[in-house]
A protein has these predicted regions:
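Alpha-helical membrane insertion/targeting regions
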Residues: 1-182
Length: 182
């Protein structure tokens, strides 16, 4: 695959994800339309994440390990947030399942990667990396805490996780676009 093809695939799938995001965002929450548009949005986000490796690895510039670290970190964060947003709704009546294996694996993963990105950002004097590290550090830590928490849950705990994750996806979609356009 050529770099330009991978880039166009990423742009096209990402554009579909952005359109689906806004369709979901503007629809009545919980309505059949919201669910009908929201499901393909999550799938489009996962597909967008899958198009990132070819874009990074086929770039016509010298190999840069920093880009690989960024790729792994951001892909793990987006994949985690998509999973949390989806499962919060699907498993809202099953809190133990929701905070089960995927929370116990993904929480420490994104928290650890966030720490790596923070250290790398501080060592390189890169404020963007240092700022982006908070996503993994904060979100991963919250996931670890929630997975271990055994106190009674708020009646709409699942909605808090869903909305929080969806706002994270808003940031991922629009932040990436802003970074590219800038």
């Amino acid at each position: 695959m050529r770099y330009d093809h991978s880039l166009w695939a990423h742009v096209c799938i990402g554009s579909v994800a952005m359109a689906l995001f806004w369709g979901t965002f503007l629809s009545a929450k919980g309505s059949p339309l919201h669910r009908r548009i929201g499901r393909p949005f999550f799938l489009a986000m996962l597909a967008t994440v899958l198009t990132v490796p070819p874009v990074v690895l086929l770039r016509p510039v010298p190999f840069d390990p920093g880009w690989i670290v960024s790729l792994v970190y951001l892909s793990a964060c987006v994949g985690t947030v998509v999973t949390v947003a989806w499962t919060a709704i699907r498993w809202k009546d099953q809190p133990e399942r929701f905070r089960g294996l995927h929370f116990r694996l993904l929480g420490p993963l994104v928290a650890s990667l966030g720490a790596v990105v923070l250290v790398a950002g501080l060592v390189k004097g890169d404020p963007v990396a240092a700022v982006l590290s908070w996503v993994g550090l904060a979100y991963g830590t919250a996931m670890i805490y929630f997975a271990r928490r055994r106190a009674p849950l708020h009646r709409q705990w699942w909605l808090a996780w869903h909305v929080n994750a969806t706002l994270g996806l808003f940031t991922a979609v629009h932040g990436t676009l802003g970074f590219v356009v800038w």
